[in-house]
Curated annotation (Swiss-Prot):
Family to which the UniProt record says this protein belongs: Belongs to the alpha-IPM synthase/homocitrate synthase family. LeuA type 1 subfamily.
Assembly information from the UniProt record: Homodimer.
UniProt pathway annotation: Amino-acid biosynthesis; L-leucine biosynthesis; L-leucine from 3-methyl-2-oxobutanoate: step 1/4
Organism: Prochlorococcus marinus subsp. pastoris (strain CCMP1986 / NIES-2087 / MED4)
Cofactor requirement: Mn(2+)
Reactions accelerated catalytically: 3-methyl-2-oxobutanoate + acetyl-CoA + H2O = (2S)-2-isopropylmalate + CoA + H(+)
Alphabetical keyword list: Amino-acid biosynthesis, Branched-chain amino acid biosynthesis, Cytoplasm, Leucine biosynthesis, Manganese, Metal-binding, Transferase
GO annotation terms (biological process): L-leucine biosynthetic process
SMART domains, per database record: LeuA_dimer
The keyword Iron-sulfur belongs to this UniProt entry's keyword annotation: no
NCBIfam families, per database record: leuA_bact, PRK00915.1-3
Protein encoded by which gene: leuA
Protein known as: 2-isopropylmalate synthase
Length: 546
């Protein structure tokens, strides 16, 4: 049996695999904001990124290791392919963290070996001990992943895992890379690994999975029953293609059905000890932060964090809930941090009151950031009678999107009506050369006119592929949250903004998306799975040194 920590370890990969979602690229400040919130949430491991991908990715992982990693905080992990330069870059990036981990991987399925790596099984059996040993010479905590494990030959998989553990791996990760398996198959795979790998008791078994068939969470729960003790997941289930296993769904399944799962951890069914270290009351806030910063809306019927997760439309259901919530609800909404708290903040509220409420909500802002947030609060309070927690969340989440901006919106004005052509006048500041330019454009509607004017000013080729708007709170004076997604060279970039004027919000969201596009082109990142490991700069060395 694999090493058992006595509970489930939550490995969050929102900042690495989650960021690989189309349009979900994040800047440094956004990654830091999410990392801080993940630490408050109580995750055991934060996979902060893929340091070798680009200087920007390296810097982000390094900064998270420096300011989020701590003796009492989460382990800070970086991803590295089974290559000396990848592993070295990963080590240098995570080095400031007191608790650090190198996560290295190589594919083990025949389809990946033949068509992607162009390597033989013998090649892999040589690379694994060499690269895991090299990583072990740098840090003690080593995670090794057998990419596409669920489609690998089991006997070869056992051999690779045994070699990795012998070479120093302390966690063995079993990915269902393409979301191919069913729960019974995945559970059996974990059971068979426990049974057939002689030294498996020296490592923790981890699982990683994608949601291509909608089975990722179910697969993970079955894996946990069969000995997996680390679950790799993302907030809101974001990730490549159909996404990853959802952190909030996994955690709440283990929380609500604890009496069922306890026996698989050697506990009595009525044991009150939590199965994870997650502070569940932070789930909703974390979900909203990730949604706002990535520009990826949460579907209304999403389990746990969707807008309809605790809503009841049927009269029969409403009657039952009014009499006793347990009739139709298995989770108390307050358990995941969802409440109806409406605070008495308005235009007469002072800086200290706003700071106190933000601190109660878990936000730790610097003096400069607090000043900026308070200025935005006062601006909003002049237009909105009551400021709610959701309004404050929108203010703070939008604020961290401001760094790395080549373009800043200075002024927007629109003219439209049933008998006139929608016309927009937009003034934009270029922060690189400190110039200010104005353009006028006509569109099919006010938002289209604004986007046409911005395109004329920026001259950045793009295609608008999504525009969505939703109300943050109730009331005619509510903030409107706008999400815009644009495409350039088959890559998608998201922008998000909130304002009581949805046209202004749309303008800011479009500018945010354009800024992401501009800075993404400067990063020139590589992909950990799709880019060629045989590039000379990625070449595996025969005698790796520190």
């Amino acid at each position: 049996m694999s090493k058992d920590p006595g509970r489930i370890l939550i490995f969050d990969t929102t900042l690495r695999d989650g960021e690989q979602s189309p349009g979900a690229s994040l800047n440094l400040e956004e990654k830091l904001a999410i990392a801080h919130q993940l630490a408050r949430l109580g995750v055991d491991v934060i996979e902060a990124g893929f340091p070798f991908a680009s200087p920007g990715d390296f810097k982000a992982v390094n900064k998270i290791a420096e300011v989020v990693g701590g003796e009492n905080g989460p382990i800070i992990c970086g991803l590295a392919r089974a290559s000396t330069n990848d592993i070295k870059a990963c080590y240098e990036a995570i080095s400031p963290a007191p608790k650090k981990r190198i996560h290295t991987f190589i594919a083990t399925s025949d389809i990946h070996l033949k068509h992607k790596l162009r390597k033989t099984r013998s090649d892999v059996l040589c690379i694994v001990p060499e690269m895991v040993s090299y990583a072990k010479s740098l840090v003690d905590d080593i995670e090794f992943s057998c990419e596409d494990a669920s489609r690998s030959d089991p006997e070869f998989l056992y051999e690779v895992i045994q070699l990795a553990i012998t070479s120093g791996a302390t966690t063995i990760n079993i990915p269902d890379t393409v979301g191919f398996t069913t729960p019974s198959e995945f559970g059996k795979l974990i059971f068979d690994i426990n049974k057939n790998v002689p030294n498996i008791d020296e490592a923790i078994i981890s699982v990683h999975g994608h949601n291509d068939l909608g089975l990722a969470v179910a697969n993970f729960l079955e894996a946990a029953k069969n000995g997996a003790r680390q679950l790799e997941c993302t907030i809101n289930g974001i990730g490549e293609r159909a996404g990853n296993a959802s952190l909030e769904e996994l955690v709440m399944a283990l929380h609500v059905r604890k009496s069922f799962f306890n026996s698989f951890f050697g506990r009595s069914s009525d044991s009150p000890t939590p199965l994870t270290a997650i502070r569940t009351e932070e789930i909703t806030k974390t979900s909203r932060l990730v949604s706002n910063l990535t520009g990826m809306n949460v579907q209304p019927n999403k389990a746990i964090v969707g807008a309809n997760a605790f809503a009841h439309e049927s009269g029969i259901h409403q009657d039952g809930v009014l009499k006793n919530r347990l009739t139709y609800e298995i989770i108390d909404a307050k358990t995941v941090g969802l409440n109806d708290n409406k605070i008495s903040l308005g235009k007469l509220s002072g800086r200290s009151a706003v700071r106190a409420r933000l601190e109660e909500m878990g936000y730790d802002l610097s003096r400069e950031d607090l000043n900026d947030a308070f200025a935005r609060f006062k601006e909003l309070a002049d237009r909105k009678r009551e400021i709610t927690d959701r309004d404050l969340e929108a203010i703070v989440s939008e604020q961290v999107q401001l760094p790395e901006s080549k373009f800043q919106l200075s002024h927007v004005q629109v003219s439209c009506g049933s008998t006139s052509k929608p016309t927009a006048t937009v003034t934009l500041i270029n922060t690189e050369d400190h110039t200010e330019d104005t353009a006028v454009a006509i569109g099919t509607g006010p938002v289209d006119a604004v986007c046409e004017a911005l395109n004329a000013l920026t001259k950045v080729p793009n295609e608008l592929i999504e525009f969505s708007v939703k109300s943050v709170t109730e009331g005619i004076d509510a903030l409107g949250e706008v999400t815009i997604r644009i495409r350039n060279k088959n890559k998608i970039y998201s922008g998000h903004s909130a304002d009581t004027d949805v046209v202004v919000a749309a303008a800011n969201a479009f500018v945010n998306a354009l800024n992401r596009l501009v800075f993404s082109e400067k990063k020139n990142s590589i992909h950990p799975q799709f880019d060629d490991l045989e590039n000379p700069k990625n070449k595996v060395l025969s005698n790796p040194k520190k």
